[in-house]
Structures are given as structure tokens and as C-alpha cells.
Amino acid sequence: MASSNLLSLALFLVLLTHANSASQTSFSFQRFNETNLILQRDATVSSKGQLRLTNVNDNGEPTLSSLGRAFYSAPIQIWDNTTGAVAASPTSFTFNIDVPNNSGPADGLAFVLLPVGSQPKDKGGLLGLFNNYKYDSNAHTVAVEFDTLYNVHWDPKPRHIGIDVNSIKSIKTTTWDFVKGENAEVLITYDSSTKLLVASLVYPSLKTSFIVSDTVDLKSVLPEWVIVGFTATTGITKGNVETNDILSWSFASKLSDGTTSEALNLANFALNQIL
């Protein structure tokens, strides 16, 4: 069975065994503090060191119409305009989404790569990423969403994990059997040689896993420098709310010459630990 520590260790061992990068960034948070984060709207760090993306009341219950985003404080170079190199950028994190007994979940959270200086967009099903569901090439946005509520205009009916490129309407999805209150461990990798983005989610206590992948040309979608982090929202109608907490997060970005495939190999390694 995989664990957060195993994923984090594997992530950094793989990166450290390759020394052909011109630019590399890595960090790992087992507890969060505000020093290394950019927090927007309702995002806070709890007294337990958890990254709480959306608001809760004094009783610890989630509130309606909450939107929060959080990013690593320093910009990340995702590709190099001089050499054309694109970064291999694996990340692993653990999150927990809980739902009150008298409620259904809404709306979800996402791991995102956005232009430096990006500000929150619309709440609810748009996850703070967009103002509408139409494709916008000027959004320069790549995200992996963990969507807990069906939105008729752009979502497939089951709850799902999706890859988003410049639109909340995912280019690829997989059904996600969401379980409230369970820790979910996520590994996302990008292989710069194949342009393959792979996202996997595991519920360790249940021994269930989900995976989605598609090709994404990061160099054509994103600016050279981006911010990386998370966004989450709660529902805008009564009876649809959830907590959205990130418990730990590891990230590494390494400019590649396009000849290695450590990102894809790492995804396969992680999946083999839990299948």
C-alpha cells in the first residue's frame, strides 16, 4: 500500500538521480504555514498545519459560496524560451473532503498551474478558475480537477477527475467514486518528452485507485513562468457544501532536454505500490 511519505520519497529520489537540468525547484510540506504560501480569498492554514481552502464556521462546518486558492510563494519556470526545454514536474499531495450528514458535496478542488499574478475567478462549479465554461486560449490554465458535483453545462454525470486546459470543460475525465472524510493521495506527473500528463488518486484505507491521462503541450498553453497550487469551492445552493483540506504537498520541477521519461516511470511506480 502506498503512503504519502512513500510517494514523496519516490518523487525526490527520482529527480535527484538525474542531474541534467538547468533549473530545478523542489519543496515538501508535511505541515503548512503561511510563510511559503500565497493565500487568496477564504484559504487559510489551520492550527493543525492543514491548508484549508474553503471556509468553515465556528462549529467546523463548511459554509456556502466559499472560494479559496493557495499557491507556492515563488514562481516556477515550466519551460525555457531560450532552449525550448520543458520541465518534468511531478507533484504529490494528500487531501480530505468531508461533507455534513445533511448535505451533498459541492463543488470540488483542483491542482493548478496558472499565470503569475492570477486572481480568483467565479465560484461554484467554475472552481475559482474561470468566469464561464467556454474555452479561452488567453486563460493559460492547466488543472487537474476533483469534481464532486455535476454541472449540466460542462460536466459528465458521474463525479470525476478531469484534466482541464483553458476551460472548466475537461479534455479528459475518469469516473471517481468519491468517499467523504477519507484521505485521498494524489500523484500527478508530466513527461516532457511525450507531453503526457498522468493523474492518479488512491484511497489507501479502501485500496481503490483512479487514473486519468492525456497529452498536453504545456509550452503552447502556459507562459514560461507560472504559479502552482490549489483552488477549491463550495456549493452556492443550500444542501451542497464540503470541506476542502490539503494535508501535505510535495512538488518538484526540473527542466528536461526531452530525452528522459522519469515522470511517467514515477507514475507507474506509484500505481504499482497500490494495485
Swiss-Prot record:
GO terms for biological process: defense response. One of its GO terms (molecular function) is toxin activity. Glycans are attached at N33, N81, N101. Keywords: Glycoprotein, Lectin, Mannose-binding, Plant defense, Signal, Toxin. InterPro entries: ConA-like_dom_sf, L-lectin, Lectin_LegA_CS, Lectin_legB_Mn/Ca_BS, Legume_lectin_dom, Leguminous_Lectin. Residues 1-21 form the signal peptide. Pfam families: Lectin_legB. Belongs to the leguminous lectin family. Antibiosis properties of legume lectins are proposed to be due to the lysis of epithelial cells of the intestine by binding to the carbohydrate moieties of these proteins. This insecticidal carbohydrate-binding lectin is toxic for the cowpea weevil. This is Erythroagglutinating phytohemagglutinin. It comes from Phaseolus vulgaris (Kidney bean).
